């Protein structure tokens, strides 16, 4: 079943950081709390995943396939997003099969795991790397390791806009 684009647009609070030494220097600092976006899809992960989810939905894909290690925050966020929004996820993992808190979560969230070994994982930069995976999972859209790439780079603009909104809320503005 094709991905249905989620209508989920979390916001992150901008929290002023009040320290005496900053006040003496007349410096105002605030921290954009991306860790508070969501307990599982937090930090920069949502901003990197969202454009890939949107592209997969536009292409009529049923889900996403991506790469990472046995402790990958990217795969963890991807699996959590798949579970929350109801799309298929497949993880291609570096190394030999191992059980970690992350891999247990990935499986609990419904991600299918394939262990590539170390040599197989090094092949990810080859031009033909995705070919056998596209044949095996034609309904899935591939996502670069860590969610990187041009789509993710463009998503950082959303982070800037989020910061502007929060700064205006503090009365700072840009």
Describe each PLM feature range:
Residues 1-174:
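PLP-dependent amino-acid enzyme catalytic core
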């Amino acid at each position: 079943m094709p991905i249905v684009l989620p209508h989920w647009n979390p916001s992150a609070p901008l929290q002023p950081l009040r320290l005496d030494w900053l006040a003496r220097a007349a410096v105002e600092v605030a921290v954009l709390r991306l860790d508070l976006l969501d307990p599982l899809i937090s930090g920069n992960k949502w901003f990197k995943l969202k454009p890939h989810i949107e592209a997969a939905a536009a292409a009529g894909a049923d889900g996403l396939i991506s790469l990472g290690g046995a402790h990958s925050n990217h795969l963890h966020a991807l699996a959590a997003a798949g579970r929350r929004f109801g799309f298929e996820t497949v993880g291609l993992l570096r190394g030999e099969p191992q059980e970690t808190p992350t891999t247990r979560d990935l499986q609990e969230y419904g991600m299918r795991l394939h262990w590539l070994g170390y040599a197989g994982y090094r092949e990810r930069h080859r031009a033909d790397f995705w070919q056998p995976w596209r044949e095996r999972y034609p309904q899935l859209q591939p996502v670069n390791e860590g969610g990187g790439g041009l789509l993710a780079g463009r998503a950082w603009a959303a982070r800037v806009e989020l910061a502007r909104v929060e700064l205006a809320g503090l009365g700072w503005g840009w």
